[in-house]
Regions:
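Interfacial segments of alpha-helical transmembrane regions
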Residues: 61-71, 121-158, 220-231
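Extracellular TM2-ECL1-early TM3 structural module of rhodopsin-like
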Residues: 75-118, 183-192
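Extracellular N-terminal segment of 7TM GPCRs
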Residues: 1-43
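Extracellular loop 3-seventh transmembrane helix
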Residues: 34, 107-118, 181-200, 222-290
Length: 348
């Protein structure tokens, strides 16, 4: 076993445990998982734009931004697959020094794209919030501004830190060859970033909830709308799993083996985020399916009804109009809220 391992790798990681299978390699399954979630994200975006076409509504900024995020996630997926080619998913004793250095070069670039993709997805979601919730409340405005701050500052912190992660910078991947230099505690840094990103996910997920529960509709229907938006909770779950694997990476010398699941979940997390960001826009497609089922089985329409009585010139009418405006915006963006107005005009 000793003779089959690169002596320079043994100098770094020590001898492999006696029961280690040096032929084990998860690269193929890792690649399949990454491609699968990437395709799901692409399908979600395609359905989102199909729904736009059905509604005959214009493409908004949040739609364009989600496309940018998809391009970034595609870049991270390509790097993750390249990492598997060089040995991510194998035991460290089954790779040579050159391959290990290539993996760390990939990891360096991957970090920049991953942090950017997370930020862009969050910005797309915030742009969506700003369109459907036409609120002038100070608390909501501050919540949105803080959400933008968290989203934009995250990649900036990552980029600045990674730009100074080692002195000299190439020591990040040449350190295994015994070059002279210093680096920060990289694994702890990655773990901290994972936790911060998950906290940001939770925060952005919760921003619209108070506003939704002030809409003029039944509690059951408000819970339904909140539930659609809260599907983003799957992203938080994916973040938690990713943090687990980052923790495992920080504890082991078998870093290449541990990088396999880290790469998977670092791609799965933003892909789930893209799917979750697209789900609220897909109601027109659901309604087409529902209408076909209704015509076949005679089921009743269960769309959310919101009725406002607007009395000309009254303060109450103005407040009702503001609430209904938010609800109608939700309908246009895919969460189907049907708004009917009754205009009463005094006959003179």
């Amino acid at each position: 076993m000793e003779s089959s391992s690169d002596p320079q790798i043994i100098a770094i990681a020590g001898l492999p445990p006696p029961d280690t299978n040096l032929t084990a390699n998860t690269a193929a399954s890792d690649r399949a998982a990454i491609i699968t979630v990437l395709i799901l994200a692409l399908i979600a975006i395609a359905l989102r734009f199909t729904a736009r076409n059905i509604q005959q509504t214009k493409i908004h900024w949040d739609d364009w931004v989600i496309i940018i995020s998809m391009a970034l996630v595609g870049g991270t997926a390509g790097l993750a697959i390249a990492g598997g080619h060089y040995g991510a998913g194998k035991h460290i004793w089954a790779v040579d020094l050159d391959s290990l250095q290539q993996i760390y070069k990939i990891l360096f670039g991957y970090t920049f794209l991953y942090s950017a993709s997370c930020a862009v997805i969050k910005i797309s979601i915030l742009l969506f919030y700003s369109r459907i919730f036409l609120s002038t409340e100070r608390l909501f405005a501050l919540s949105m501004k803080f959400g933008y701050f968290l989203s934009i500052s995250y990649p900036i912190v990552v980029w600045v830190t990674m730009g100074n992660v080692c002195r000299p910078l190439d020591h990040f991947w040449t350190q295994f060859a015994g070059t002279k230099g210093t680096c920060i505690d990289i694994n702890t840094f990655f773990l901290a970033l994972g936790i911060i990103n998950m906290i940001n996910d939770f925060y952005i997920l919760l921003i619209p909830i108070p506003h939704i529960f002030r809409l003029q509709m039944s509690l059951r229907k408000r819970i339904g709308i909140a539930g659609i938006l809260m599907l983003g909770g799957f992203v938080c779950a994916a973040s938690a799993v990713r943090i687990h694997f980052l923790t495992e990476l920080s504890k082991t010398k078998d870093v290449t083996r541990a990088m396999g699941p880290v790469f998977i979940w670092s791609d799965l997390e933003p892909c789930i985020a893209i799917v979750s960001a697209c789900l609220p826009h897909l109601a027109p497609l659901r309604h087409i399916v529902r209408d076909k089922i209704s015509s076949t089985f005679g089921s009743q329409d269960d769309e959310v009804e919101l009725t406002n009585r607007i009395t000309g010139g009254s303060a109450a009418g103005h407040a009702a109009s503001t609430q209904s405006s938010s609800a109608e915006n939700i309908h246009r963006q895919g969460i189907h809220v049907h708004t009917s107005y009754t205009q009463q005009t005094d006959q003179r």
